[in-house]
């Protein structure tokens, strides 16, 4: 059915959940059908609780990167999180980032998740800390969104925080979740400075 997602938008959630749970890739035909239906979904109003539950279920899994990359490839991620969609193909204006903003944010999640399976001695402590985090989905969401403010070409942290306010309302996040996300967004550049100028083993 070529219009199946327009008839029932929530089937999109089922497709990506199933693909993640069974470690499957989307077929080219399914990608085509999803893309074809996107214009019909742009004005659809997702329920906050359903959108939050869907995104957090994906973020709670160990392979969030793969499924978010697949969602981004067919522009579903930008449909659900327009703030992220704005930074697609956006180039960083510095010497430190090799990839576009969208790819950088997704790869940040990949690097974090790789710590779970880490076997390198020098990363053992970081791996242990990561596995002790009680709400990894919040940390991953902050990574996904941390540079989205660069889409406007202004102060990306200030813009990112404005974007984040909209996302917090749209997802209906709890006060503690919102506070943590804002803290991570506001101070993420400090992590960059620390990584470049400090001995992380000290």
Provide a role label for each language-model segment.
Residues 13-16, 106-109, 161, 165:
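Predominant activation on well-ordered alpha-helical scaffold segments within soluble catalytic domains
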Residues 1-95:
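Non-catalytic interface/linker regions that flank or bridge core catalytic/transmembrane domains
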Residues 73-89, 93, 99-143:
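Active-site-adjacent "gating/activation" loops or surface patches in catalytic cores
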Residues 100-101, 127-202:
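Divalent metal-dependent catalytic cores for phosphoryl transfer on phosphate-bearing substrates
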Residues 20-24, 39, 60-63, 73-76, ...:
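Non-catalytic alpha-helical coupling and interface elements of nucleotide-dependent molecular machines
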Residues 1, 23, 116-120, 147-152:
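Structural motif corresponding to the C-terminal cap of alpha-helices
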Residues 5, 44-48, 61, 98-105, ...:
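Conserved phosphate/pyrophosphate-binding and hydrolysis machinery centered on Walker-type P-loop NTPases
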